[in-house]
From Swiss-Prot:
Its EC number is 2.1.1.182. The keyword rRNA processing applies. Disulfide bonds: none annotated. This is Ribosomal RNA small subunit methyltransferase A. It catalyses: adenosine(1518)/adenosine(1519) in 16S rRNA + 4 S-adenosyl-L-methionine = N(6)-dimethyladenosine(1518)/N(6)-dimethyladenosine(1519) in 16S rRNA + 4 S-adenosyl-L-homocysteine + 4 H(+). Keywords: Cytoplasm, Methyltransferase, RNA-binding, rRNA processing, S-adenosyl-L-methionine, Transferase. SMART domains: rADc. It comes from Nitrosomonas eutropha (strain DSM 101675 / C91 / Nm57).
Length: 256
């Protein structure tokens, strides 16, 4: 099949067989796994995954690709022709392993969507822009550390596994990519009931990165509150750990 990648779907198809083999080794698919592939494309990962699995669920929006996959992998592949951003992953049960070469144009909102189902997930392995992965795994007091780091690290432990060069794709993207492994925390750092407050407060904290917390969180905390939390209000948002943001969230919830 000659499929022209569609820009509106952010399609870049993986074609490097050495890289594909490395990714499959990292994922380590096993018979009995309840595995889901998001954006299978022309099956670069699909076939080697199926070689190790009893069945594979695939989520693909492009109708032409769905037709191709249906013809070539009908026996063990279950295809959902839907937008992954709107898909209810709880419909597939629990103990899920999710993989995929995620479309670059929806990767961040899709990660936030998937985080809602973290209690049903064993692990996730995704191909993403390298700069996105670096932001996901970033630590405090580094340039890449920000809201994305905190929101995802609250739910997942994450590790950058492999850098994938642009020439491994057709067409080559303008950026490097990387494989990230995400494993849900047994218990999120922020309780589920406080995540909305946590997200709003973190958004405010990073709204002006060069300003101090005294300014960015002035609608949430007084100097007395900072003293009680033992946090220097002269610090910037990037200087605080997830645990410190957790303490701030709980404190705000208590005093409201």
């Amino acid at each position: 099949m000659r499929h022209i990648p569609r820009r509106r779907f952010g399609q870049h198809f993986l074609v490097d067989h050495h890289i594909i083999a490395e990714i499959i080794h990292i994922i380590c698919p096993l018979p009995g796994d309840r595995m889901i592939e998001i954006g299978p494309g022309l099956g670069a990962l699909t076939q080697p995954l199926l070689n190790n699995l009893d069945t594979l669920q695939a989520i693909e929006l492009d109708r032409d690709i769905v037709d191709y996959l249906s013809r070539n992998y009908a026996e063990k592949l279950v295809i959902h022709n839907v937008d992954a951003l709107k898909f209810d992953f709880s419909a597939l049960g629990e103990g899920l392993r999710i993989v995929g070469n995620l479309p670059y144009n929806i990767s961040t909102p899709l990660l936030f969507h998937l985080s809602r189902f973290s209690n049903l997930i064993i692990d996730m392995h995704f191909m993403l822009q390298l700069e996105v992965v670096e932001r996901m795994v970033a630590q405090p007091s580094t340039p890449d550390y920000g809201r994305l780091s905190l929101m995802l690290q609250n739910r997942f432990e994450m590790e950058q596994m492999l850098i994938v060069p642009a020439e491994a794709f057709n067409p080559p993207p303008r950026v490097q990519s990387a494989i990230v492994c995400m494993r849900p925390r047994v218990v999120p750092v922020i309780p589920f009931g406080l995540e909305k407050l946590f997200g709003e407060m973190v958004l405010a904290a990073f709204s002006q990165r060069r300003k101090t917390l005294r300014n960015t969180l002035r609608h949430y905390l007084t100097i007395k509150d900072f003293d009680q939390l033992r946090i220097d209000p002269g610090l910037r948002a990037e200087n605080l750990s997830l645990e410190q943001y957790s303490a701030i969230t709980r404190h705000i919830h208590k005093i409201r």
